[in-house]
Amino acid sequence: RIDMIFGRKAKQAEYIVDVHCHILPGIDDGSRSIEETLKMLRIAADEGITHVIATPHYKLEHNNATPGQVDELIDAVQAEASKNNIPIVIYQGNEVLFFNEFDEYLENKSFCRMNYGDYVLTEFLPTDRFSYIRNAVDDVLSTGCVPIVAHVERYECMASNIENVRTIRNMGADIQINASSVTGGGGKNVKKFVHSLLKEQLVDYIGTDAHRCEGSRVPNIRECSNILYKKYDEKYVDSILYGNAMDRIIQ
């Protein structure tokens, strides 16, 4: 058999939830048009993605879209996707760059929780100190929400010390890494770090963080999925590709 000669064939997930994607057109630095959005969705579907949480950037003192505007765009994109027979369901979210008034803006519903629930995709600057991120996680948790720390591998204080990731996860934060980091797109050191997280089962979600329909920031996840199923426990991989997102966010 071919799989005996060349190694075990990777399982294909029945569902894949992309929890981090800049798919909505003209709203941030992601897709620039509905045409590009549809191309991104076609790529995502071909990669096995079945559900996408749209996570446009939300940054204090920027010209951010309101949750209502995000909803309107999602409805329009979903209609176009259906019209073009692209079998993907899109949900509301934001990628929120943490700021000190987070709780006030959350209470005022200024930005989107993930699918109207209790999870918020939360971003930091690469050079933010661990004490700042730890305090931010505590602040978000105090609101009753759970921070999903976006692309944790980008933060110097995390990538230099896996125990810092363990600490914020033990506090109650969830951890997201990018699919491209698993395959080496972020470089050797990043790849080594995310695989150390995966070995310790410190990752809760995989996202593409896609911004474009071509180049290096497209919604590719199949190569990542194949690697995960070959290297790690199948039930754990199921959970980070779709199970956790289905249970905690999409429900």
What are these regions (language model features)?
Residues A45, L141, R169, L198-K199:
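Non-catalytic positions within long, well-ordered alpha-helices that form the structural scaffold/packing
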Residues E14-D18, V52, Y119, P147, ...:
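Hydrophobic "anchor" residues on beta-strands that sit immediately upstream
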Residues R8-G26, I162-Q176, T183:
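Mobile, glycine- and charge-enriched loop segments
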Residues M4, R222, N226-Q251:
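Mid-to-C-terminal alpha-helical segments outside catalytic/metal-binding sites
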